[in-house]
Amino acid sequence: MKIYDFVNSELEFLRAECNFSDEELEYFNLRAKHYSNLQISLIVNVSEAKVSVLAKRVKTKIKKVL
């Protein structure tokens, strides 16, 4: 599952239904714009390991909703 493959209506649905934390939502929005995990870590000034944790949490929430 690639977040950037979702269409806008699906992205809006997931934003509304997944109850993302602020960090998770920021990650979700950046991935929707095709940013890589490395780019995201540089933008939000966290380690790549932290971004990997965010990715896992976001994907888990998406799978629960879908």
Feature locations, PLM:
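Short helix-coil-helix linker/hinge
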Residues: 17-24
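Short alpha-helical "recognition helix" segments of helix-turn-helix
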Residues: 40-44
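Short, Lys/Arg-enriched C-terminal cap helix and immediately downstream tail that follows
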Residues: 59-66
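A short pre-motif secondary-structure segment
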Residues: 27-28
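Residues in the helix-turn-helix
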Residues: 39, 50
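Short, Lys/Arg-enriched N-terminal segment that forms or immediately precedes the first helix
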Residues: 2-17
